[in-house]
Swiss-Prot record:
Substrate binds at residue 192. Keywords: Endoplasmic reticulum, Lipid metabolism, Membrane, Microsome, NADP, Oxidoreductase, Signal-anchor, Transmembrane, Transmembrane helix. It is an enzyme of class 1 (oxidoreductase). This is Retinol dehydrogenase 10-B. Retinol dehydrogenase with a clear preference for NADP. Converts all-trans-retinol to all-trans-retinal. Has no detectable activity towards 11-cis-retinol, 9-cis-retinol and 13-cis-retinol. The keyword Acetylation does not apply. CDD domains: 17beta-HSDXI-like_SDR_c. The active site is at 205 (proton acceptor).
Length: 336
């Protein structure tokens, strides 16, 4: 095929991809079933991780929950088991007792510090031994230091990078080989809108999320280059979610109604729809797509001007001040 013909084919494919993307706005794609599939969720003990676990439980997936907090992880597991009990069909037949073992909830919990690759690899080996091969990997675990750059201890910066970014390397390296062998699987990266554009005062968090997105996109291209179309990738980039992680963050009060913090339940439902329809990327709310596009075409000074108008230039400062006050109070109580 000469270059002119190839250019025509490429142009047609690009136009066709726009047509397909537009069609999905009007025709909702059919959601795939994850019943019986093994789903690993990191950071499952609270926040979005817990909600992801409950959503997958409602769809009868086998849950493998990872968290550094054993107690909160077990609480999530018990919530999932309760969902399983409610979903259990009541046949009323005489042989229903024989069917019960097939209907028992399948929830496994593991205590794992995803910032440590040795812990990740060891836990992944336990999962393969005790549960089997996995089908879905939800890289969700995340932390925020809540400190200005010059006030933030190096250890906190390192931990933010390790949990929010490096952990994605370790979990993927642990589970991807079998996915490649079977040409089957789904990897979900729960990032943030702060991995697409930035604001002042959260340099470490933004850098970690930019890194996670870069890792995700590069891996997506690698899988396509290897013709591993059976392995799906979904990137989740929500706006600030009302989980308490960024409590105190404020923009200009006149603009606040247009950019409210997302309800966690809404965020996860939108993400689940994207995952179950094999959507490559989901930004919530949709205006985040426009914000990301504007960043690529507007001069930097224009972006700064818009930030100041919205109040986004210092929106994290109340949150940082609140974190600092909380830290000082804790130190005074403990006599540090």
């Amino acid at each position: 095929m000469n270059i002119a013909t190839e250019l025509f084919v490429v142009t047609f494919k690009i136009i066709w991809s726009f047509v397909l993307a537009g069609a999905k706005w009007f025709i909702r794609p059919r959601e795939k079933s994850v019943e019986g599939q093994v789903c690993v969720i990191t950071g499952a003990g609270s926040g979005l991780g817990r909600l992801f676990a409950l959503e997958f439980a409602r769809r009868r997936a086998t849950l493998v929950l990872w968290d550094i907090n054993r107690q909160s992880n077990e609480e999530t597991a018990e919530m999932a088991r309760e969902i399983y009990r409610q979903l259990k069909p009541s046949t009323g037949s005489s042989d229903s007792v024989q069917e019960l073992p097939l209907l028992q909830p399948k929830v496994y919990t593991y205590m794992c510090d995803v910032s440590k690759r040795e812990s990740v690899y060891l836990t992944a080996e336990k999962v393969r031994s005790e549960v089997g091969d996995i089908d879905l990997l939800i890289n969700n675990a995340g932390v925020v230091s809540g400190r200005h750059l010059l006030d933030c201890p190096d250890e906190l910066i390192e931990r933010t990078m390790m949990v929010n970014c490096h952990a994605h390397f370790w979990t993927t390296k642990a589970f991807l080989p079998k996915m490649l062998e079977l040409n089957h699987g789904h990897i979900v990266t729960v990032a943030s809108s702060l991995g697409l554009f930035t604001t002042a005062g959260v340099e470490d968090y933004c850098a970690s999320k930019f890194g996670a997105i870069g890792f995700h996109e590069s891996l997506s291209h690698e899988l396509k280059a290897a013709d591993k179309d059976g392995i799906k990738m979904t990137l989740v980039c929500p706006f600030l979610v009302d989980t308490g992680m960024f409590e105190g963050c404020k923009i200009r009060k006149e603009m606040a109604p247009f950019f409210p913090p997302l309800k966690p339940e809404y965020c996860v439902k939108q993400a689940m729809r994207a995952i179950l329809t094999d959507q490559p990327m989901i930004c919530t709310p949709r205006v985040m797509y426009m914000v990301t596009f504007m960043k690529t075409v507007l001069p930097f000074d224009a972006i700064v001007c818009m930030y100041k108008f919205i109040g986004a230039d210092k929106c994290m400062y109340p949150f940082l001040a609140q974190r600092k006050e909380s830290t000082n109070n804790n130190e005074s109580k403990t006599g540090i």
